[in-house]
Amino acid sequence: MKNKLPPFIEIYRALIATPSISATEEALDQSNADLITLLADWFKDLGFNVEVQPVPGTRNKFNMLASCGQGAGGLLLAGHTDTVPFDDGRWTRDPFTLTEHDGKLYGLGTADMKGFFAFILDALRDVDVTKLKKPLYILATADEETSMAGARYFAETTALRPDCAIIGEPTSLQPVRAHKGHISNAIRIQGQSGHSSDPARGVNAIELMHDAIGHILQLRDNLKERYHYDAFTVPYPTLNLGHIHGGDASNRICACCELHMDIRPLPGMTLNELNGLLNDALAPVSERWPGRLTVDELHPPIPGYECPPNHQLVEVVEKLLGAKTEVVNYCTEAPFIQTLCPTLVLGPGSINQAHQPDEYLETRFIKPTRELITQVIHHFCWH
């Protein structure tokens, strides 16, 4: 029953008080089971059917899908339940206690992005879900901050095909219809160690990596020349050399060298295409030194994403907000949800607060976010 639903600020407080950190380090990683249970109970109270989905390959993580209404199409509102870890020494407040001060709500996940679920639940108080003409779906995912395993698995396994979706990441209520992807690789070269007094008796992995880097930088230049998307502030795919390590002593021939790099592809560039370009760039080194060079993923790749600019979802949201859609350089779960239906990224709070000490959401977002959620539900589920 709706009268069982706590007040908005108490929903928010309970979400922030329930830790759900995702991290690659097992010691920091936490299950989101308790948070999923909270959300599931609240949506059941509102009359939704709720399905909780274990996410394979994770440390006890779950997705939740709440659904109401019959038929095809409808609207999907989506967000992730996890947060990044926090640096205790840099926070001046308890990250798990919602604190309101000077027009701001402080806490880990206030902006990115547990708060979005509080806004959805609050908006649904005034919606008679029994009268929906099209279905409404609420998706809460796991592990967005690390592998995006929750969104990947949901997109791979669901039969749902809504008319459209909105992911409530913090965009300051500015609608986002496209972003770049992210590919992160480790280039590893295995040499042959030996005493530095006789270089010919070994294979110096640093020297081979020097050769490989030259080819990678040529790929970077080629990407910049061949691919363009003028709407982005950086209108071409970027390639960054982020970390390198090799050798262990000045008097030893380096036996191993490893380089970590990333590429941020434009929408429309496929992951297979990029892998092919990287392999082609490194082919001269591999051919000269067979079996010594390998390329491995550091993280599961994320493709670029774009919602068609003339789609009804874009037109409706631009009209409701009086603002044009934008493109951004950071990544979200949108590429995976977009495989199901046209998708926008749109939510309260600023991306500048994401992953920051003393994360906060400004209270000025409360009223317009509630109104926006109500309006899009009315438009896509009642018309």
Curated annotation (Swiss-Prot):
Its EC number is: 3.5.1.16
Reaction(s) this enzyme catalyzes, per UniProt: N(2)-acetyl-L-ornithine + H2O = L-ornithine + acetate
Q: Which Pfam families match?
A: M20_dimer (PF07687), Peptidase_M20 (PF01546)
Give the annotated active site.
D82, E144
> Record's superkingdom?
Bacteria
Named in its record, the pathway it takes part in is: Amino-acid biosynthesis; L-arginine biosynthesis; L-ornithine from N(2)-acetyl-L-ornithine (linear): step 1/1
Q: Name one GO cellular component term.
A: cytoplasm
| Task performed by this protein | Catalyzes the hydrolysis of the amide bond of N(2)-acetylated L-amino acids. Cleaves the acetyl group from N-acetyl-L-ornithine to form L-ornithine, an intermediate in L-arginine biosynthesis pathway, and a branchpoint in the synthesis of polyamines.
* The protein, known as: Acetylornithine deacetylase
Identify the species of origin. Escherichia coli O17:K52:H18 (strain UMN026 / ExPEC)
